[in-house]
């Protein structure tokens, strides 16, 4: 089975449409400029989850503010450029939007990845004040997620706390990665969740970085 080699720009454009959500994602795992062919929004949206620098373009619009904030943190600290647009059935609740964005983002990561010459394994710790989280990732083609955040509140902003681990689980399943994310301590749920996403960003960034070879990091000789 052919394996793709690490290249300067690893990119994906994903469109996902169901009866519940319409999603468009443009991703570059290595930063740089990204755009979408045509926005799904009739009127262009900008919010606090938009950040443009010399090395990254990040614009997250899911309609769920705290979800935007978490994906923004994931992209920023992972070194990605990322545009996420979603129109979802938020008149029902936040479930379909959160789950489907996780699936679409996982699809984008899987499509963008190169599998030769990557480290494959990555780990990261991230503190946010009193909160400390750990994430460990394996680009394994064995989709599995263990997420223990210990959140106590019903919601953070307009995002149900039960949907935060579900987003991460949906992402891992679609990206075909093994992922363990744990919040080790902390009493502020906002801090606990955000430190977890930042730790995951650090872990993924390490796992997809070059190992200095052109080899597939597996005894099987293949990953995906």
Curated annotation (Swiss-Prot):
Gene3D superfamilies: Imidazole glycerol phosphate dehydratase, domain 1
Domain of life the protein comes from: Eukaryota
Assigned EC number: 4.2.1.19
Pathway(s) where this gene product acts: Amino-acid biosynthesis; L-histidine biosynthesis; L-histidine from 5-phospho-alpha-D-ribose 1-diphosphate: step 6/9
GO biological process entries: L-histidine biosynthetic process
SUPFAM superfamilies noted in UniProt: Ribosomal protein S5 domain 2-like
Keyword Transcription: no
PROSITE patterns: IGP_DEHYDRATASE_1, IGP_DEHYDRATASE_2
InterPro entries in alphabetical order: IGPD_sf, ImidazoleglycerolP_deHydtase, ImidazoleglycerP_deHydtase_CS, Ribosomal_Su5_D2-typ_SF
A matching Pfam family: IGPD
UniProt catalytic activity: D-erythro-1-(imidazol-4-yl)glycerol 3-phosphate = 3-(imidazol-4-yl)-2-oxopropyl phosphate + H2O
Keywords: Amino-acid biosynthesis, Histidine biosynthesis, Lyase
CDD domains per record: IGPD
GO MF annotations in UniProt: imidazoleglycerol-phosphate dehydratase activity
Family the entry assigns: Belongs to the imidazoleglycerol-phosphate dehydratase family.
Protein name, entry field: Imidazoleglycerol-phosphate dehydratase
